[in-house]
Design a protein with these regions (language model features):
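HotDog/MaoC-like acyl-thioester-processing domains
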Residues: 1-7, 94-96, 107-169
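Non-catalytic linker/capping segments at the edges of enzyme domains
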Residues: 1-46, 151-169
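Residue-level preference for beta-strand/loop junctions
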Residues: 23, 36, 81, 96-98, ...
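Short beta-strand micro-motifs enriched in acidic
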Residues: 32-34, 90, 105-109
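A conserved, well-ordered hydrophobic junction motif at loop->secondary-structure transitions
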Residues: 39-63
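Hydrophobic residues positioned within well-ordered beta-strands of beta-sheet architectures
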Residues: 40, 83-85, 100-102, 116, ...
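Hydrophobic residues in beta-strands and at strand termini
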Residues: 42-44, 89, 137
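Hydrophobic beta-strand-centered segment that forms part of the acyl-chain substrate-binding groove
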Residues: 67-101
Length: 169
């Protein structure tokens, strides 16, 4: 698997709660291309809890939405917006775990409408939550007008273990 570059690094005003590494209260997600899927390893901690030692459901929803957005960005080379999102919470995500795996895949595409599925998986491989997201993708010219920059896979091939190690530092 290879890391996806973040093309907005250094762009004035870029402060995405989910993926900007410079946002002091953000999630600082990094993304990787794993076959056809986009993957992120999210390090856990008590700052993200709702109930004691439990990851807040709103944080889970944000992780699921953002991974789908990056799947769209990489797949189509354009931007888009979430038009519908349905989240199912299957089991608690414990903030005492070192990390979770967040993954997105394309289910269906009809012209500029995409159906994506995202999952949150525990370190032991259990499904914790998932979302089905419908996205509206912008025509490339519209995306350029609003400052969209495409992302691409960069660097050397990495194993899952290497991605986990570099993500939970």
């Amino acid at each position: 698997m290879k890391q996806l570059n973040n093309p907005w690094l250094g762009v004035e005003g870029y402060n995405c709660f989910a993926c900007a590494p410079s946002n002091p209260i953000g999630l600082k997600m990094k993304f990787f291309l794993d076959g056809d899927d986009v993957l992120s390893i999210f390090p856990l901690g008590s700052n993200y809890q709702g109930w004691i030692d439990t990851l807040h459901g709103g944080i889970q929803a944000t992780l699921l939405d953002e991974i789908c957005a990056w799947k769209l960005i990489h797949l189509l080379g354009t931007s888009g917006v979430t038009s519908k999102m349905e989240v199912r919470y299957k089991r608690p995500v414990l903030t005492t775990w070192p990390y979770i795996v967040v993954r997105a895949e394309l289910i269906e595409q009809r012209r500029n409408i995409l159906l994506l599925r995202a999952t949150i998986i525990s370190p032991t491989g259990d499904l914790c939550s998932y979302a089905e997201c419908t996205y509206y993708s912008f025509p490339p010219e519209k995306a350029r007008e609003i400052g969209f920059l495409p992302c691409e896979a960069i660097g050397e091939e990495l194993t899952l273990e290497e991605v986990i190690a570099m993500s939970i530092l």
